[in-house]
C-alpha cells in the first residue's frame, strides 16, 4: 500500500466521535460474536493453514467452479494489488472519485491510468476509450456510496469486449 490511505486517528491525540477513515464500525454489540468465538476456541487457537486452499476448494465446490477460479485474499486491498500485478502495464481506466488503492496499485505495477469522471452513458453510448483494456469500477462506490444498476453494468461490459 502506498502512503495516503488508512486510519490515522492516532495522530490527533484526542477522541474522534466518528471516524470515516475506514469502513470498520465499532459502535455495535459484539456479544453474539463473542459467544460464537467462545464455542470455537479449539479450532481458532491453532495457527491457520499457510495458504487458503481448503477454503478455496470449499467455495469452488459450493459455487460449482474449478478451484483454480477461486482466490481468497486477506481483503480487498490485497486483491486489488494482485489484479494490478497480473495485468501489469495495461491501459487502465479508473472511474473517479473512488478508493485510492486502485490508482496506487496501478501506478506500482506500471499501468497507464486514465481517470474518468463520468461513466459513458450519453444516449446509449457505453463505449470506453478504445485503448482501455482494464477498468476499475467500485460498486457501491467508496467514498460516494453511488450504486450503478446491474442493467447498466451489463451494457457497459457487453459494449467493451476489449476490456
Residue ranges of each PLM-predicted region?
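N-terminal "arm"/small-domain region of PLP-dependent enzymes with the aminotransferase-like
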Residues: 1-46, 139
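Conserved beta-strand elements of the Class I
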Residues: 18, 71, 91-93
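Conserved PLP-anchoring active-site segment centered on the Schiff-base-forming lysine
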Residues: 84-107, 112-114, 125-128
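Short, well-ordered alpha-helices that flank and scaffold nucleotide-derived cofactor binding pockets
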Residues: 35, 61, 81, 85, ...
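Glycine/Thr-rich phosphate-binding loops of Rossmann-like dinucleotide-binding domains
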Residues: 28, 80-81, 102-103, 144-145
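Short loop-beta-helix segment that forms the pyridoxal 5′-phosphate
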Residues: 48, 60-82
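Generic structural marker for isolated residues within well-ordered, non-membrane alpha-helices
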Residues: 34, 56-60, 153
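Active-site phosphate-binding strand-loop segment of PLP-dependent enzymes
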Residues: 118-163
Amino acid at each position: 500500500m502506498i502512503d495516503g490511505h488508512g486510519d490515522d486517528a492516532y495522530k490527533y491525540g484526542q477522541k474522534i466521535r466518528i471516524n470515516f477513515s475506514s469502513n470498520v464500525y465499532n459502535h455495535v454489540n459484539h456479544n453474539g460474536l463473542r459467544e460464537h468465538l467462545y464455542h470455537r476456541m479449539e479450532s481458532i487457537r491453532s495457527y491457520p493453514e499457510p495458504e487458503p486452499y481448503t477454503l478455496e476448494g470449499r467455495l469452488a465446490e459450493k459455487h460449482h467452479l474449478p478451484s483454480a477460479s477461486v482466490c481468497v485474499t486477506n481483503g480487498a486491498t490485497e486483491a486489488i494489488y494482485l489484479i494490478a500485478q497480473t495485468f501489469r502495464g495495461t491501459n487502465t481506466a479508473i472511474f473517479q472519485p473512488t478508493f485510492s488503492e486502485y490508482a496506487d496499485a496501478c501506478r506500482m505495477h506500471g499501468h497507464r491510468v486514465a481517470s474518468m469522471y463520468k461513466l459513458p452513458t450519453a444516449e446509449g453510448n457505453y463505449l470506453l476509450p478504445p485503448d482501455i483494456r482494464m477498468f476499475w469500477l467500485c460498486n457501491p462506490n467508496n467514498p460516494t456510496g453511488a450504486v450503478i444498476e446491474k442493467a447498466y453494468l451489463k451494457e457497459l461490459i457487453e459494449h467493451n469486449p476489449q476490456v
